[in-house]
From Swiss-Prot:
Part of the energy-coupling factor (ECF) transporter complex CbiMNOQ involved in cobalt import. It comes from Halobacterium salinarum (strain ATCC 29341 / DSM 671 / R1). Belongs to the CbiM family. GO terms for cellular component: ATP-binding cassette (ABC) transporter complex. Forms an energy-coupling factor (ECF) transporter complex composed of an ATP-binding protein (A component, CbiO), a transmembrane protein (T component, CbiQ) and 2 possible substrate-capture proteins (S components, CbiM and CbiN) of unknown stoichimetry. This is Putative cobalt transport protein CbiM. Pathway: Cofactor biosynthesis; adenosylcobalamin biosynthesis. Gene3D superfamilies: 1.10.1760.20.
């Protein structure tokens, strides 16, 4: 879903930066506070960031100007919530834009909004809704899958409003549907695989520190 450098019109690039910056700033403050309060949080933050980096770097060419890949945000969402996930995603996306040619600086705001903000919020809502009823791994699986799929829905919206297929709302909606249809071919199975990976990793992390289940409000 990394929209490449220079692909979005300037006005839309600016809009997404304006949306992303406050969330990233709040996430940075929350991440710093968590790291200060608990030494083990530092290692878990590092693991969550590494999971985002590794999975989101596995790109497959997709819609013109974008790619398909896992997002890797599920672990961060479950452990720390959407604000921290937004900050970690922004760091990863900036690094990838500067050093890997993946995404871009002008499109960084748009990429953060889709992968670091809206997708994680959707995943977090799903996790909070399910964790009283499912075990930790199943709730994490669902959260990671929904975060992934929502990310690509948002990217489709970003591309659709920037490049409508025709005049008016109908042209925007048609363009969004077209982008989402192409993404879905690869992203539906990718999201399911990502959910399985996230579930496996969260299970391993929980085994190393049983108190995580209590903090997250799960019993199994």
């Amino acid at each position: 879903m990394h929209i490449m450098e220079g692909f979005l019109p300037g006005i839309w690039a600016l809009v997404w930066f304006v949306v992303a910056i406050p969330v990233i700033s709040y996430g940075a403050l929350k991440t710093a506070r968590l790291a200060r309060n608990d030494e083990l949080n530092k290692s878990h933050i590092a693991v969550a960031a590494a999971f985002i980096f590794v999975l989101s770097a596995l790109k497959i060419p997709s819609v013109t100007g974008s790619t398909s890949h896992p997002t890797g945000t599920g672990i961060a969402v479950v452990l720390f919530g959407p604000a921290v996930t937004a900050f970690l995603s922004a760091i990863v996306l900036l690094y990838q834009a500067l050093l890997l040619g993946h995404g871009g600086l002008t499109t960084l705001g748009a990429n953060v909004v889709s992968m670091g903000v809206v997708g994680p919020v959707a995943g977090w809502v799903v996790f909070r809704a399910l964790n009283p009823y499912l075990d930790l791994q199943k709730a994490t699986f669902a959260a990671a899958v929904i975060a992934d799929w929502t990310t690509y829905l948002v990217t489709s919206i970003q591309l659709g409003v920037a490049f409508p297929s025709g005049p008016g709302v109908a042209g925007v909606v048609d363009s969004i549907v077209r982008f989402a249809s192409v993404f879905s071919i690869t992203q539906i199975p990718i999201g399911i695989v990502e959910g399985a990976l996230a579930a496996g990793l969260i299970g391993y992390i929980a085994m190393s520190r049983q108190s995580i289940k209590t903090r997250l409000g799960v019993t199994a």
